[in-house]
Amino acid sequence: MLTKNELKSTLKEVLSTQATSYDYQDTMEYLVYKAFDLGADDVDIDEHDNIYITKGNADVYPCVVAHTDTVHDIYKGYKVYEIEGNFVAYDSDSMKQVGTGGDDKVGLWVCLEMLRNHDNIKIALFSQEEIGCVGSSQARKTFFDDVGYAFECDRKGNSDFVQNSSGVKMFGKKFKKAIQPI
């Protein structure tokens, strides 16, 4: 288990990658490298640049999903700093604060930490979400055949747990209690 400072360091590392919906190759290379570094058994990239990661051998896997792009521009002088417990990014060329791409880099970080901490897990990382869910709409459905449940961590804040989709309750109290340790 990583310490709080180590977790912050890995989050800063992920936030330091830059990606837009049209320029995300560096982030993809970083994610593939990290996946193997964290013990992934298989990493596959489809024709839509979605990344599929499998670790372990299970009849049924938990799955975590995120997306690889952000709405922010790419800056040559981009650097992430921690200030009073918050991560901020600055472009040294313009000397202005810029976005960190927390949407969905925090989701990518969660995926990597789940990969680090679980022996059997699947992860799907979708491309071009910010321009209309391009990658996820073309997802390889067979990747999910042996997935028991999936988490998506693309949320504002941390005070809620979405249990409904389009007015449909997705699971009950028993499931929520079972996944609480995660």
Show which residues each predicted segment covers.
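Polar low-complexity intrinsically disordered regions
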Residues: 1, 37, 177-182
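Mixed-charge, polar/low-complexity N-terminal
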Residues: 1-3, 131-132
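N-terminal catalytic or cofactor-binding beta/alpha core of small enzyme domains
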Residues: 2, 16, 60-64, 76, ...
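Acidic/His- and Gly-rich active-site-bordering loop/insert found
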Residues: 4-90
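Alpha-helical hydrophobic/aromatic positions enriched in membrane-embedded helices and signal peptides
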Residues: 10, 59, 95-96, 146
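Short acidic, glycine/Ser/Thr-rich loop/turn "cap" segments at secondary-structure junctions
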Residues: 86-100
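Acidic/histidine-rich catalytic neighborhood of metal-dependent amide-processing enzymes
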Residues: 96-100, 104-181
